[in-house]
Regions:
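A conserved pocket-lining segment of Rossmann-fold NAD(P)-dependent short-chain dehydrogenase/reductase
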Residues: 162-182, 194, 206
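Rossmann-fold cofactor-recognition segment
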Residues: 41-51, 71-73
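Glycine-rich "substrate-gating" loop/helix at the edge of Rossmann-like oxidoreductase active sites
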Residues: 144-153, 173-185, 209-211
């Protein structure tokens, strides 16, 4: 398959690109060109996705079997991309977030649980709603907290920094809040697994590790 990845040079995109190339797919990245491709020989189309006219100019005429939209935060990010390829792409995989769910004491969250319209990830919800209303063969991925090598967010690095400097680790609340983590390689593998899977079309999937932990347990 010829596959377009929006981004592809930071964290999740690095491992997704590597796995898709290993599986024999022809991968094309679209990004600003600020970082090298994670795999040599991968084609890179340079542009700014926040400029719809430039996006159309750069991508119109290209043919892709599948698209991974890893960095669309708002509907305005993703809609122009969908409008270009909605009549031709076989599978559009959208990176959403497990942060869209309404706070609940019933854990773990299931895909059908209530969502929070005031979530800071509202743009993700708007995009999912838009994709559902379009004639687009899409799958939405909702990952939990992702960790692993080359993480550009100071998540695990923050903890290790305090540990090596013998600094205390503050624990929110009473320490019994439940959270769940997922390794970046497992997320990339899950994203790859939806390709050529007809049952994944127009579906939403939570992706996380198998175990949960309290903040006390994490500390």
């Amino acid at each position: 398959m010829r596959i377009l990845i929006m981004g592809g040079t930071r964290f999740i995109g690095i491992y997704l690109t590597q796995q898709l190339v290993e599986q024999g797919h022809k991968v094309v990245l679209f990004n600003r060109g600020n970082r090298p491709a994670p795999v040599s020989g991968v084609e890179v189309i340079t542009g700014d996705r926040t400029n719809p006219e430039q996006l159309k100019q750069k991508l119109q005429g290209e043919k892709f079997d599948a698209i991974f939209d890893n960095n669309g935060r708002e509907l305005t990010d993703t809609q122009p991309l969908v409008e270009i390829f909605q009549d031709s792409v076989q599978h559009f995989v959208y990176m959403s977030s497990a942060g869209v769910y309404l706070k609940s004491d019933q854990m773990p969250h299931r895909e059908g649980d209530a969502v929070d319209p005031k979530s800071r990830h509202k743009g993700k919800l708007d995009t999912e709603d838009y994709l559902m209303k379009q004639n687009v063969p899409f799958t939405s991925i909702r990952p939990t907290y992702i960790y692993g090598p080359q993480n550009y967010n100071d998540l695990e690095a923050w903890f290790f920094d305090r540990i090596v400097r013998n600094r205390p680790i503050p624990i929110p609340g009473n320490g019994m809040h439940i959270t769940q983590f997922g390794h970046v390689k497992d997320l990339a593998n899950a994203m790859c697994s939806v390709l050529n899977n007809s049952s994944a079309i127009r579906q939403t999937y939570n992706v996380s590790g198998e175990r949960f932990v309290t903040f006390d347990g994490l500390a």
